[in-house]
């Protein structure tokens, strides 16, 4: 039986572990934190959508659309889809025109509906400057319920989840991969998969792997209370705002491209300073300023909502390809860096089933 190591216990890493175990592989998952789903997965909006968020990149939109139903079916108990989502196109500041948006909707072939602008006021949304409103039934993932679901499924499988296990280095020994921790060896494996959302310093010493230039974002998402009907709103496509329910709770999560990107760095690995516990304290002024900007945007979008921050700031890290500003492409895919060494590029959580099935078959054929 071949032995696979997966580094990263986010939704992509865990779903792949289940896929491989069901195919007959021995699987170890290594997670540096003490709880599964506590990295990038936990610091995002946890949106699952049907592609409307990506009108400038049809392939990303179609990948989300074709995976939506299977994701909801797979994770039903952790998905809240009991609210309406609204996508607003602005007359000014958008990166696409009304004509381009209409063409995109036709090409995507989703079940989205264009609604009348006058309905915005009934929802408590400021209609000023809005040129188009599209309604779509979508959902969000409840993180606590997703953790419970995975914990239950992992407990009845022969999968070892190694928490508080930071992989410091990877070395190659013939056809095997040797994983090293802080002061001890973690094991030797036939196949290695990186599901670390672009954080790959552990393989920087491998001469067989070429470093890849990525754009890394230090991100801010806020949890807030809003006095509004339970809905989701995304203003597209530019530097606007997204407001979505937080799972099944009575809170909302908000994100805006420019204020939520606290720092941007282009390189071959995540900046070391972001990985220290002191980063948030040292950048408290930056975080507070960005939070204020986000709250002001919420007040502009929902004038009567009385927004109040209700949780600690969610500070995360995301990685995207370089020079993607024109299209905002976020496709998820797999790269084979070397024989039996794979890296998952995770664009959106709703792509995890497609990616894990593809990679499972690929490893099974090797």
Question: Where in the sequence are the language-model features?
Answer:
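N-terminal Rossmann-like FAD-binding beta1-loop-alpha1 element of flavoenzymes
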Residues: 2-28
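Glycine-rich FAD pyrophosphate-binding loop
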Residues: 22-42
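Central helical "cap/lid" subdomain
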Residues: 37, 185-237, 246-250
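Dinucleotide-binding Rossmann-like beta1-alpha1 core, especially the glycine-rich loop
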Residues: 45-123, 129
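Helix-loop-beta segment of a Rossmann-like dinucleotide-binding subdomain
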Residues: 79-90, 117-157, 338-346
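Helical element adjacent to the flavin cofactor pocket in flavoenzyme catalytic cores
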Residues: 134-183, 187, 191, 195-200, ...
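Flavin-binding catalytic cores
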Residues: 261-317
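C-terminal catalytic lobe of FAD-dependent flavoproteins
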Residues: 299-366
């Amino acid at each position: 039986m071949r032995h696979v190591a997966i580094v990263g216990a986010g939704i992509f890493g865990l779903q792949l572990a289940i896929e491989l175990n069901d195919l007959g592989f021995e699987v170890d998952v290594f997670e540096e934190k003490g709880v599964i789903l506590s990295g990038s997965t936990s610091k995002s909006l946890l949106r699952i959508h049907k592609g409307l968020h990506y009108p400038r990149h049809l392939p990303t939109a179609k990948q989300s659309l074709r995976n939506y139903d299977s994701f909801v079916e797979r994770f039903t108990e952790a998905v809240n889809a009991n609210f309406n989502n609204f996508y607003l196109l602005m007359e000014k500041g958008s990166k696409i025109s009304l004509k381009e948006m209409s063409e995109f909707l036709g090409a995507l072939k989703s079940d989205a509906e264009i609604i009348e602008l006058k309905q915005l006021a009934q929802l408590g949304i400021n209609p000023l400057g809005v040129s188009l409103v599209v309604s779509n039934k979508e959902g969000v993932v409840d993180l606590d319920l997703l953790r419970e679901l995975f914990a239950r499924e992992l407990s009845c499988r022969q999968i070892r989840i190694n928490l508080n296990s930071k992989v410091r280095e990877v070395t190659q020994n013939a056809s095997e991969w040797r994983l090293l921790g802080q002061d001890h060896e973690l094991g030797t494996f036939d196949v290695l998969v990186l599901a670390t959302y672009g954080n790959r310093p552990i393989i920087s010493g491998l001469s067989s792997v070429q470093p890849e230039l990525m754009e890394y974002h230090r991100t801010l998402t806020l949890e807030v209370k809003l006095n509004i009907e339970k809905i989701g709103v995304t203003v597209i496509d530019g530097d606007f705002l997204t407001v979505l329910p937080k799972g099944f709770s009575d809170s909302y999560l908000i994100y805006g491209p420019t204020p939520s990107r606290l720092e941007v760095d282009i390189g071959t690995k995540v900046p070391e300073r972001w990985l220290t516990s002191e980063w948030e304290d040292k950048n408290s002024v930056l975080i507070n300023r960005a939070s204020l900007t986000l709250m002001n945007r919420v007040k502009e979008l929902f004038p009567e909502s009385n927004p109040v921050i209700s949780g600690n700031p969610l500070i995360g890290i995301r990685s995207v390809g370089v020079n993607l500003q024109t299209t905002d492409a976020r496709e998820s895919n797999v790269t084979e860096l070397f024989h039996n060494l794979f890296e998952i590029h995770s664009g959106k959580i709703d792509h995890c089933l497609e990616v894990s099935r593809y990679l499972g078959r690929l490893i099974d054929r090797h």
